Amino acid sequence: MDDACVIVGDHWRIGVLTESLIRLEWSEDGAFEDHCSQTVINRNFQSQDSVERRVYDQDGLLVIDTPYLHLSYDRRPFSKEGLQIQVKGMDGFNGTWHYGASQHANLKGTARTLDGADGAIGLGDGVISHDGWAVLDDSSSNVLVAEEDGDASASSSRPRVAPRSSGRQDLYFFGYGHRYRQAVQDFYGLTGPTPLLPRFALGNWWSRYYKYTADEYLALMDRFAAEGIPFTTAVIDMDWHITEVDASYGSGWTGYTWNEDLFPDPERFLHELHRKGLRTTLNVHPRDGVRAFEKPYARMAETMGVDPATGEAIEFDVTNPEFVDAYFDMHHDLEGEGVDFWWIDWQQGGVTKQVGLDPLWMLNHLHYLDSARDGRWPLTFSRYAGPGSHRYPIGFSGDTVVSWESLRFQPYFTATASNIGYGWWSHDIGGHMSGIRDEELEARWYQLGVFSPINRLHSSASPFNGKEPWNFHEPVKSAMVDALRLRQALMPYMYTMNWRNAVEGRELIEPMYWQYPEQGEAYGVPNEYFFGSELVAVPITEAMDKASMRAKAKVWLPQGEWFDFFSGRRYRSDVASGMNFYAWRGIGVMPVFAKAGGIVPLQSDNMTNSTENPEALEILVFPGDDGKFSLREDDGRYAPDGDIERMRVSDTVVSFDNASSTLTIAAAAGDARVTPERRTWTVTFRGVAMSEVQIDGEYSSDTSYDKESLSLTVRVGCKATDKDVTVSFPHGLELAADPVSDDVFAICNDAQIAYPLKEAANAALQEHGTRALPSLKTLFYESKDQNGGIHREELSPSVLSAVEEVLFRC
């Protein structure tokens, strides 16, 4: 820590890292820890010149006062009586932390795994809370020590990881009130930024625990391509290696030798996947080390000083530097055949030969650092190993049960992980095991996958559990295909958010309360979240109601004007507290909203596996307010020294001026080698009426209008990327009239209710319009059954609620 931020005594040390972040240390031996730890790698991320604080004595207590915190301490071993910090601006009781207090109001973080989960599980703490404070205890983590000089280092390729001395406490107090985003950004400052992901990681992943042959796998990829279903990542589960081994060796879960019965020419197989536009990861379970039946055994045994003739197993030991070197040499050989990155499937607990060292953390740390060698783009795929794990993306959440309960938990789980800075979870989309077949459930899970950090389809080896869309009936099949195509189309948008995350510490997915911390309603929609800067996503996690033929999701829209991303319908949230309602959707879509002024870039040629910067782009515009989006692209090459600020990048700013009804696509700024010299642009305005259009000041008739989505599409054509392009409406861009009658008729038409009741409902709507709801609530239809009894039927609650959404949206 910078000496300027430190107040120190014989056995205690306090560091004022920011005006809201305090480090608290107690040491029985009077020595303090300055090395990087497994979690914390930078305690000097903010200039002390910008930190305002006063330090003084008052009634025998040490007092530290900043604009946000008031700390008092008796200079004794930490106790609830002797150490407290008040967060200014928060409730006097709940906003004051006493040492050892329970974090009962913590907004939570994430968990190591969802293995075996069938619904909600407990989560660890995050760095934000309702009460305005959170505590990160780093006392037990190991420290990183460079071999050559003993100095702390997190950048050395393989720094030594050493246990801490006993009798020391090391706490970080986050007192940010409800400045949640700032708290997480400073957590990144303390623990390191989230790395930039390679572009291919944001596309669709195909994964299945299944004994494919090479020919079967390649044929499947060809079938996807023929169906126009894009994938960018091919996951090969554990059957790539030999799994049927002699019982004397133990289980077949660990392996490093290709199963040549399934993959007779591994290098050719991986080359073919690359040729088809797919990057590849192989699954490994490292626990059992390297045994005598493995091809790499002899060389590794000699390296480790074991006589290969003995057949003695090479024990897995990440605390042994010799083993680690030999272990990675073995992986490098496989990478030389074409493996792009590794799926580290560690499920065997948290104990190594070194006190306090979790093997999962060590594997993640070493694999990620190793993956960056020789200018490669670093990437690994593994489970969460505690705070700071965001430095080693991507996260594998584990094997979940196929159930509505599992689906229902995942949006909340994903968004809440942002509270501990963990933004790149990859779930088993569709669920992995057990459960029951439910085609609607699978479709909804695919839709969640589109608006998830990573979209990786996965399933078990059961012949009945394949996730290929053609295994499902219509309309589920089409919903699945549409979802996968949309995910690929969203890549320019998501990749820009990927850059935002790496540079600004702004995650792709943020809970609603990050942006609206003082709105109580924002805490009441746990499955709703911001998906990047422009969109709010609300996955449907309940089964369809049979009466309305729709499924619902609880929605809260903050004050302002919003548009349905798919249909262009406009929602006016006029009051300061926002608008609460249930959104009802058929199987084909889920609720996604864009605020007025929203701009979303899509790649038009989305039915390919390409991850190149596209030559054709579509810009979705949601009018009603000014908007701006800066599209970030790079040349696909990672910075050799890991400094992404030195990468070749290009920014294309797209802006919409609502007053003049003009969209401007600015000339690309930055490295001209990044973007195509010419690019074909299409601009689609959602929620508008048909209007006359000019392109660069000239009237254009190359437009089309889609009544279903209230969308005006302008085909701009192929333009040089070093010149501005404008799309304007000389007579103004008029918002579309709200098709209330059409939408309510569609609800009534789909409803599985008596025809006379449909007709009565339609008549009430024709007569009363948007004021028809009281009449609809009192409607009923009586009929006689075959025994002469009277049967009374009213509009079902689901039909009424679906109609209510339409009537109240504007």
What are these regions (language model features)?
Residues 14, 22-26, 63-71, 536-539, ...:
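Short, well-ordered beta-strand segments enriched in hydrophobic/aromatic residues
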Residues 36-51, 306, 563-587, 692-716:
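Solvent-exposed beta-strand/loop surfaces of large extracellular or lumenal domains
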Residues 116-117, 194-197, 201, 207-264:
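A conserved hydrophobic secondary-structure block that centers on an alpha-helix together
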Residues 368, 387-395, 409-413, 417-427, ...:
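Catalytic core of carbohydrate-active enzymes
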Residues 96, 230-480, 515-521, 525, ...:
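Aromatic- and carboxylate-enriched substrate-binding clefts and catalytic-loop regions
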Residues 52-199, 208-209, 214-215, 221-226, ...:
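Catalytic and substrate-binding clefts that recognize carbohydrates or anionic sugar/phosphate headgroups
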Residues 17-59:
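A low-complexity, Ser/Thr/Gly/Pro-enriched, surface-exposed linker/loop concept
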Residues 736-790:
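Charged/polar low-complexity intrinsically disordered segments, enriched in acidic residues
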